[in-house]
Design a protein with these regions (language model features):
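Anionic-ligand anchoring segments at beta-strand to alpha-helix junctions in alpha/beta enzyme folds, i.e.
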Residues: 1-21, 186-187
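Glycine/threonine-rich phosphate-binding loop and adjacent beta-strand/alpha-helix elements that clamp
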Residues: 17, 308-329, 340, 344, ...
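A short helix->loop->beta-strand "cap" motif at the edges of active sites that frequently abuts
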Residues: 47-54, 278-282
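Long, well-ordered, tryptophan-enriched scaffold segments
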Residues: 49-56, 61-145
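Flexible glycine/proline-rich, aromatic-decorated loop/lid segments
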Residues: 64, 289-324
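A glycine-rich, hydrophobic/aromatic-adjacent loop/helix-cap motif
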Residues: 142-246, 406, 416-422
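Long, low-complexity segments enriched in small/aliphatic residues
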Residues: 198-199, 204, 366-465
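Long, contiguous, secondary-structure-rich segments that constitute the structural scaffold
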Residues: 234, 330-398, 440, 456, ...
Length: 555
């Protein structure tokens, strides 16, 4: 999000799922789309099979989508910017750019041209391992299409240079004018069903709803008036998850309230996270299962599942949709909204008669009649969603921005201008991953997901059908590396990084390049995040889950 926000002014899919089939070229990177976003992968395959689209896949692994690729570039982990800068070099050098679009709708072109002047495909090959002719071919294929769309997911954002990766992709789209039309754009595929909605609602440390910055005096004043706060909303952005954990370890953070998250399995460098939790004085977990984090909490608040909730989700294409409960809440469980409002009322302490404004006891009224009342407040305070109402959502989903009651929603962003006015080229200098293989740790660990499970497995591993399909985690290793080490399928192997050790069954495969190891992070029995580091992107603060130097040993 941070990368696109700086480049375009908003951090979301520019286009809709429905217009994927109108693309002539699809560039997919950092996304195992078949397993992480299966519906979207079907649209991509339909574009290829039925409409003749060409797929450029950039992924070190031979994922299922590789079978459909016209070109498959397999860079070394963490070398994406080198490849993408080289593609920009080819686009400019061979005049595969739309100069009219650049002149009318962008800024910073001269700076980008200078930044990539020496980024030849041969230079990128030396860094990434991708043959120069493949990089040139990818640039020509992308630049030669009238409608080319870019898609990515956490394979390139969970990196110490994730923002650079995203901005390098946006540079390609800006160079070729691939915005504002069907089958074009830059399209981050969000990690789960309501990640987009959570961010839209201000679930980030630096914004209020609709990405209104907390540093904006007018935005804060508007919310203070609506909420009748007795104390100003802080103008300073809050802490990210990684900052919170460091703060706990240093003693600055004393308590955590965690909902819908399992940091003791899904956060990086788990020994570091465990040490941080040991320093906390008070932990509250609001969830539907007693996951690893809930098991050590001081207080557990039983929430409800999606099937028991009312409200809205916003999916990856910015579509706000109604969610209706299928069953009543189970005994002992409560709606998240009710829990939060009850807590708010307790903190508001209406019995207090102090005339001095108290930052812990605001005057805010927590008497919402239900989810619809909350949405009414969202619409009243959020310009990009002011035209969306429950009455309209009963008919169907609406894509923001939707700024009036008769506005149809916005399937395609940036048709005439970018949210920030002009699209901004970002001159980027290649930076490698924080860790690279060496004599002591000669392999590179990559982590990700599989189709059958999700994140820490809090829900999917409690599904008997899904758990029967994949009951345990495996450690994937290149088949030739396995042969060299005398490792056979099912052998127990030990993976060690600078942070810890995990033992699990080996799965030799020809889908990984030599020198790479792959693990999912769904399984508490073999927690991959014991191995991952806590290096973060300096802007987005997202951890580097995809590049950890490790060694392998037979047990």
């Amino acid at each position: 999000m941070a990368g696109l926000a700086a480049t375009l002014g908003s951090g979301a899919m520019t286009n809709s799922i429905s217009d994927i089939r109108q693309a002539e070229v699809l560039l997919v990177t950092g996304s195992n789309t078949t397993e992480a976003h299966p519906v979207i992968s079907l649209e991509m395959k339909a574009a290829i099979r039925r409409h003749g689209a060409k797929l450029i896949l950039i992924d070190p692994r031979e994922i299922e989508l590789a079978e459909f690729a016209a070109l498959h570039l397999r860079p070394r982990t963490g070398t994406d910017v080198a490849v993408l800068n080289a593609m920009a070099h080819v686009l400019i050098g061979e005049n595969l750019i739309r100069q009219d679009f650049i002149d009318a709708r962008t800024e910073g072109f001269a700076g980008l041209s200078e930044a990539v002047r020496d980024c030849t495909p041969e230079w990128a090959e030396a860094i990434s391992g991708v043959p120069a002719d493949l990089i040139t071919g990818a640039a020509r294929l992308y630049g030669g299409a009238a409608h080319a769309a870019i898609f990515w997911a956490m394979g390139i954002t969970q990196s110490s240079h994730g923002v650079d990766n995203v901005q390098a992709l946006a540079n390609l789209a800006l160079l070729t004018g691939n915005f504002g039309r069907p089958g074009t754009g830059v399209n981050p595929l969000r990690g789960q069903n309501n990640v987009q909605g959570a961010c839209d609602m201000g679930g980030l440390p630096n914004v209020l709803t609709g990405y209104q910055p907390v540093t904006d005096d007018a935005a804060r004043a508007k919310f203070e008036a609506a909420w009748q706060t007795a104390f100003p909303i802080p103008a300073k952005p809050g802490l990210t998850v990684t900052d919170l954990m460091n703060g706990a370890l240093e003693g600055h953070i004393k308590a955590l309230y965690i909902t819908g998250e399992n940091p003791l399995l899904s956060d990086p460098n788990l020994h570091h996270i465990q040490s941080a939790f040991e320093k906390l004085e008070f932990v509250v977990v609001q969830d539907i299962f007693l996951n690893e984090t809930a098991q050590i909490a001081d207080v557990v608040l039983p929430g409800v599942s999606f099937a028991e909730k009312e409200g809205t989700y916003t999916n990856t294409e910015r579509r706000v949709q109604r969610v209706r409960h299928a069953i009543p809440a189970l005994d002992g469980a409560r709606l998240d909204l009710d829990i939060i409002c009850d807590l708010g009322r307790r903190l508001a302490a209406p019995e207090s008669t102090s005339a001095v404004p108290d930052p812990v006891h605001p005057v805010c009224n927590w008497d919402y009649s239900g989810p619809a009342a909350v949405w009414d407040e969202i619409a009243a305070l959020t310009p990009s969603m002011s035209g969306i109402s429950y009455a309209r959502l009963e008919i169907g989903g609406i894509q923001w921005p939707c700024t009036s009651a008769d506005h149809p929603g916005t399937p395609i962003l940036h048709r005439e201008k970018f949210t920030r006015g002009l699209g901004r080229f970002m001159p980027l200098v290649y930076r490698g991953p924080m860790e690279t293989p060496d004599e002591d740790f000669p392999f590179m660990l990559n982590t990700g997901r599989m189709l059958q499970h999700w994140h820490g497995g809090t829900m999917s591993r409690r599904s008997a059908g899904l758990d029967a399909l994949v009951p345990e985690g495996h450690i994937e290793i290149n088949i030739l590396d396995a042969q060299d080490m005398g490792i056979y399928p099912g052998d127990m192997i030990r993976v060690t990084s600078r942070r810890g050790t995990v033992v699990g069954p080996a799965r030799p495969t020809d889908r990984l390049p030599r020198g790479m190891v792959f693990m999912t992070f769904h399984f508490a029995e073999s927690p991959a995040n014991v191995l991952t580091g806590d290096a973060v992107d300096p802007v987005a603060k997202i951890p580097e889950y995809k590049a950890s130097a490790v060694r392998i040993e037979r047990v």
